[in-house]
Amino acid sequence: MEISWIGVLLAFVAGMVVAMAWYLKGAIADAWEGLTGITPEKNKPVRTRNLILLAVSNAATTVGLAFAVGLTSAATGNDSVWMAVVVGVVAWLTLSASTLLQHNSFEQKPLKLTTINTGYQLALFLAITLVLGLF
Protein backbone atom coordinates (compact mmCIF):
# COMPACT_ATOMS: atom_id res chain seq x y z
CA MET A 1 0.00 0.00 0.00
CA GLU A 2 1.34 3.39 -1.00
CA ILE A 3 0.30 6.76 0.34
CA SER A 4 1.42 9.98 -1.28
CA TRP A 5 2.08 12.36 1.59
CA ILE A 6 2.15 15.27 -0.84
CA GLY A 7 -1.32 14.15 -1.88
CA VAL A 8 -2.35 14.00 1.78
CA LEU A 9 -1.09 17.54 2.36
CA LEU A 10 -2.90 18.87 -0.71
CA ALA A 11 -6.07 16.97 0.25
CA PHE A 12 -5.90 18.55 3.72
CA VAL A 13 -5.63 21.99 2.11
CA ALA A 14 -8.61 21.17 -0.12
CA GLY A 15 -10.59 20.18 2.96
CA MET A 16 -9.77 23.44 4.71
CA VAL A 17 -10.83 25.38 1.61
CA VAL A 18 -14.16 23.53 1.60
CA ALA A 19 -14.69 24.39 5.27
CA MET A 20 -13.95 28.05 4.73
CA ALA A 21 -16.10 28.25 1.60
CA TRP A 22 -19.01 26.46 3.28
CA TYR A 23 -19.19 28.36 6.57
CA LEU A 24 -17.44 31.71 6.06
CA LYS A 25 -19.78 33.81 3.91
CA GLY A 26 -22.75 33.35 1.63
CA ALA A 27 -26.17 31.75 1.65
CA ILE A 28 -25.10 28.55 3.43
CA ALA A 29 -23.19 30.42 6.13
CA ASP A 30 -26.10 32.83 6.61
CA ALA A 31 -28.57 29.96 6.98
CA TRP A 32 -26.23 28.16 9.40
CA GLU A 33 -25.84 31.32 11.51
CA GLY A 34 -29.61 31.76 11.60
CA LEU A 35 -30.18 28.17 12.71
CA THR A 36 -27.42 28.05 15.32
CA GLY A 37 -27.46 31.64 16.53
CA ILE A 38 -23.67 31.65 16.27
CA THR A 39 -22.59 34.93 14.71
CA PRO A 40 -19.06 36.08 13.86
CA GLU A 41 -19.21 38.26 16.99
CA LYS A 42 -20.13 35.30 19.22
CA ASN A 43 -17.45 33.19 17.56
CA LYS A 44 -14.67 35.75 18.01
CA PRO A 45 -13.56 34.69 21.55
CA VAL A 46 -13.20 31.04 20.51
CA ARG A 47 -12.20 31.50 16.87
CA THR A 48 -8.55 30.45 17.28
CA ARG A 49 -9.48 27.37 19.29
CA ASN A 50 -12.14 26.41 16.76
CA LEU A 51 -9.74 26.81 13.81
CA ILE A 52 -7.19 24.60 15.59
CA LEU A 53 -9.88 21.97 16.23
CA LEU A 54 -10.98 22.22 12.60
CA ALA A 55 -7.41 21.71 11.37
CA VAL A 56 -6.81 18.75 13.70
CA SER A 57 -10.08 17.05 12.79
CA ASN A 58 -9.60 17.67 9.06
CA ALA A 59 -6.05 16.31 9.31
CA ALA A 60 -7.35 13.16 11.02
CA THR A 61 -10.08 12.81 8.39
CA THR A 62 -7.57 13.26 5.58
CA VAL A 63 -5.10 10.72 6.96
CA GLY A 64 -7.91 8.24 7.69
CA LEU A 65 -9.29 8.60 4.18
CA ALA A 66 -5.78 8.27 2.73
CA PHE A 67 -5.39 4.92 4.48
CA ALA A 68 -8.89 3.83 3.41
CA VAL A 69 -8.17 4.75 -0.22
CA GLY A 70 -4.75 3.06 -0.06
CA LEU A 71 -6.12 -0.15 1.45
CA THR A 72 -9.02 -0.29 -1.00
CA SER A 73 -6.67 0.32 -3.90
CA ALA A 74 -4.31 -2.41 -2.72
CA ALA A 75 -7.17 -4.87 -2.15
CA THR A 76 -8.88 -4.25 -5.49
CA GLY A 77 -5.95 -3.38 -7.72
CA ASN A 78 -7.89 -0.26 -8.72
CA ASP A 79 -6.12 3.04 -8.14
CA SER A 80 -8.50 5.25 -10.12
CA VAL A 81 -9.76 8.63 -9.02
CA TRP A 82 -13.31 7.29 -9.10
CA MET A 83 -12.47 4.45 -6.73
CA ALA A 84 -11.05 7.02 -4.30
CA VAL A 85 -14.22 9.12 -4.57
CA VAL A 86 -16.39 6.02 -3.97
CA VAL A 87 -14.38 5.34 -0.81
CA GLY A 88 -15.12 8.92 0.25
CA VAL A 89 -18.85 8.57 -0.38
CA VAL A 90 -19.03 5.24 1.48
CA ALA A 91 -17.04 6.64 4.42
CA TRP A 92 -19.26 9.74 4.50
CA LEU A 93 -22.50 7.75 4.37
CA THR A 94 -21.54 5.08 6.90
CA LEU A 95 -19.58 7.17 9.38
CA SER A 96 -20.36 10.85 9.05
CA ALA A 97 -23.89 11.26 7.69
CA SER A 98 -25.40 8.45 9.75
CA THR A 99 -23.80 9.67 12.98
CA LEU A 100 -24.73 13.31 12.41
CA LEU A 101 -28.30 12.34 11.57
CA GLN A 102 -28.61 10.35 14.81
CA HIS A 103 -27.19 13.10 17.00
CA ASN A 104 -29.17 15.90 15.41
CA SER A 105 -32.40 13.87 15.57
CA PHE A 106 -32.07 13.12 19.27
CA GLU A 107 -30.96 16.70 19.98
CA GLN A 108 -34.03 17.88 18.02
CA LYS A 109 -32.01 20.12 15.77
CA PRO A 110 -33.69 21.45 12.63
CA LEU A 111 -33.56 19.27 9.53
CA LYS A 112 -32.17 22.23 7.60
CA LEU A 113 -29.17 22.41 9.97
CA THR A 114 -28.60 18.68 9.58
CA THR A 115 -28.75 19.11 5.81
CA ILE A 116 -26.24 21.98 5.88
CA ASN A 117 -23.77 20.14 8.10
CA THR A 118 -24.17 16.79 6.34
CA GLY A 119 -23.75 18.52 2.99
CA TYR A 120 -20.54 20.08 4.26
CA GLN A 121 -19.25 16.68 5.34
CA LEU A 122 -20.06 15.22 1.91
CA ALA A 123 -18.28 18.09 0.15
CA LEU A 124 -15.32 17.65 2.53
CA PHE A 125 -15.03 13.89 1.95
CA LEU A 126 -15.42 14.32 -1.81
CA ALA A 127 -12.77 17.06 -2.01
CA ILE A 128 -10.31 15.09 0.09
CA THR A 129 -10.75 11.81 -1.77
CA LEU A 130 -10.74 13.51 -5.17
CA VAL A 131 -7.32 15.01 -4.41
CA LEU A 132 -6.08 11.74 -2.90
CA GLY A 133 -7.23 9.92 -6.03
CA LEU A 134 -5.22 12.27 -8.21
CA PHE A 135 -2.04 11.32 -6.35
Predicted region positions:
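Juxtamembrane/disordered regions of integral membrane proteins
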Residues: 1-135
